[in-house]
Amino acid sequence: MSNLFMDLRLTHEQPTPENTLPVSEYRAFSPERFSVEDEDKHVVYSGGSGYLVTVMKNDPTTTISINPAIVPIFQEQVDLYVLNSCLLLWSATHKFGVEVPYQKIVLHALQHQQDQDVLYLQLRPGEQLNAKTESDYEPYIEITIKSSEPHSGLAICPPGTDTIPAIYDGMAQCSALHADEDESTEEDNGNELATDIILNQSVSSSADDLDIDLEADSAEHPVVAGMSVDVGYASIAGRRKRDDQDNHPAKRRS
């Protein structure tokens, strides 16, 4: 199966000093290389402890399902590691994590909400986190990540990289390492890297947070959304993987 459709993966391997390497140290030893997926150690770009991860439900015509095995990730504070291979959400309480491949992330962006920076993601659906819609277009799953108290850095992460902007910057660097490998065969220019964009988009009405029981609660503040929703007046800066149909807000299902 193409890496483009790599799914979220459950893991019990926590990043440690023995199996990771700070990006600055790695570049000092290997300045001409920026990815070590074939080696034993993961490269750590940024990360920290004390984040809340929320699945958003903006479209009433879309049904989202979550594998019960990964539900704790969305119920409590988690640690976050931006690795060269994936974005890792780790539950210290339950001693497991969810690896999010960068190929799975359609869009990652920054938004400012209630005087707080929030990381906004759009993911392609899969077995672990799925979405079905009545629309003719394939749905994306929207996730927000924000800092919570108590919040701190982690010993194996570079100092000062536990902020949401630092998490975003680390993801931007790592995402650029992973080109989509399943672009349309009709295109002659091959695979394309993620492209910097500025999005002036937001949901034009309040969205609902998605509880684990999939019942929506009213949200007090609009949530910035991406390509397949109505737009309003707030702005976010983000980075999006280019689909093979850039002129459409989402890919039409076959």
Swiss-Prot record:
Domain of life: Eukaryota
Alphabetically ordered keywords of this record: Cytoplasm, Nucleus
Homology family: Belongs to the LOT5 family.
UniProt entry tagged with the keyword Phosphoprotein: no
GO biological process entries: mRNA cis splicing, via spliceosome; spliceosomal snRNP assembly
Entry's Gene Ontology cellular component terms: cytosol; pICln-Sm protein complex; spliceosomal complex
Lineage: Eukaryota, Fungi, Dikarya, Ascomycota, Saccharomycotina
Cell compartment(s), UniProt: Cytoplasm; Nucleus
Organism: Meyerozyma guilliermondii (strain ATCC 6260 / CBS 566 / DSM 6381 / JCM 1539 / NBRC 10279 / NRRL Y-324) (Yeast)
UniProt keyword Transferase present: no
Matches recorded under InterPro entries: ICln/Lot5/Saf5 (IPR039924), PH-like_dom_sf (IPR011993)
Protein name: Protein LOT5
Signal peptide: none
Gene: LOT5
